[in-house]
Amino acid sequence: MEKNTLIQILNNLIEKYKTLLKENGKVASGDLLNSIKGEVRVDNNLYTFVINLNDYWKYLENGVNGTAVDNGSTYSFKGKTVNTDAIEKWITVKGIVPHSINNKVPSTKQLAYVISRSIARNGIKGGHYLNNSLQSTNFINNIIEEFSKQVNIEINKITEVNI
């Protein structure tokens, strides 16, 4: 089996996934994108495709239910707010400037708190970016095709020897 071909199939999947995240505005700091690494492992003719990435990919993929809104996810927010530190970082990275309300400009911390309450209440809708990447790159079919080619090569070798 050509491991390089399998690596290329995996890399195509990863690039498509990164593209979908970018196209859908799911890149702020780039931490998730930079964490994505793929690997094909081979052990005694057992092929394993591994994608390592930050844990929060699953929330972008599957969404998170809010305390007031069910987004059909297996994950749910329990409290009234989510991690305000992460929201503050997101505000800073995105360059979001709070607008004046009643001649008072909220601090980044205050804005993060309001946003975190909204996220906890409404949840996060899943984007299914990895699943969509799997489908659009024909990942499974491409792997099956590569293994089929290898099986045909092996069958031809056997039949040539036995003829």
Task: Locate the predicted segments by residue.
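Charge-rich, low-complexity N-terminal segments
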Residues: 1-46
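Charged, low-complexity interaction tracts
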Residues: 31, 35-163
